[in-house]
Amino acid sequence: MFNDQLLAGRRILVTGGGTGLGKSMAARFLQLGAEVHICGRRKIVCDETATELMGEYGGRVVSHGVDIRNAMAVDEMIETIWTEGPLTDLINNAAGNFISRSEELSPRGFDAVANIVMHGTFYVTHAVGRRWIAAKLPGNVVSITVTWVRNGSPYVVPSAMSKSAIHAMTMSLAVEWGKHGIRLNTIAPGEIPTEGMSKRIKPGDEAGARTRAQNPMGRVGTMEELQNLAVFLISGGCDWINGETIAMDGAQALAMGGNFYQLRDWSDADWNQARDSIKAQNEKDRAARG
């Protein structure tokens, strides 16, 4: 679909690029000739991903260990990248989410999502954007959001609020920074099964089963479809698209309203089982991080 050197000369940062959707997009950018930077809290994971991708596709992938909730750490990472030259594109992919009845949310649980998704995304966008403006350079920002930025969603309120903030940031900065040649858009994908999503958003479900049963197209999304849309948005083939949120979900949001409405029918036992599953996964992840 795309010329093999479409992104040659581009330097792209993908947040949360060590796993899942971020890793997939990073791989495609690398295949198309870009120099790719990936970041995440667990540098060892990013290091392993960088080695894997370069071994498979060649090119250059640089890994960075950073907690994007820390504005100073973010700025230091961006400054380090800039010492070799400016970025041309930013992919805001890092996120966190889990299902919960809102009355059972703790402030800590809310902050765990909001600090990554809302604060972290702004910190990275601000650190990159102000450098583009100072250097009089154009740039592209593509953020990964969700379809429920337009209508909200029960049981994922921290994510709905935080992703809606990215949606608002995208529209606001598209207007403010457009005169500098900086474009901002978001992709709102439906279900593309990943390990992290299945364990905290749909614990106990077979990956993709609920979406296949409800989606007008009868299937989940694919990594390739996300890759293609991300490449298109930064490729230069659509330079007048700015401030948009593009849904890619097989019309599921139009048909169903949201991904989690059916959880209204869950019993207390269902919620207890989900909470125990999420808690066990959190403990497993903490142990893996040491």
Protein language model features and the residues they cover:
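Conserved glycine-rich cofactor-binding loop
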Residues: 11, 16-20
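A glycine/serine/threonine-rich, flexible loop-to-helix segment
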Residues: 51, 179, 189-214, 256-290
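Substrate-binding pocket helix/loop in short-chain dehydrogenase/reductase
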Residues: 101-114, 211
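Active-site loop-to-helix junction immediately N-terminal to the catalytic Tyr of the SDR YXXXK motif
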Residues: 105, 152-161, 172, 197-200, ...
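Active-site helix of classical SDR
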Residues: 125, 162, 170
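Short, small/polar-rich loop/turn modules that mediate ligand/substrate recognition or access, typified
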Residues: 178, 183, 241-243
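C-terminal helical subdomain
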Residues: 186, 206-241, 248-250, 277-290
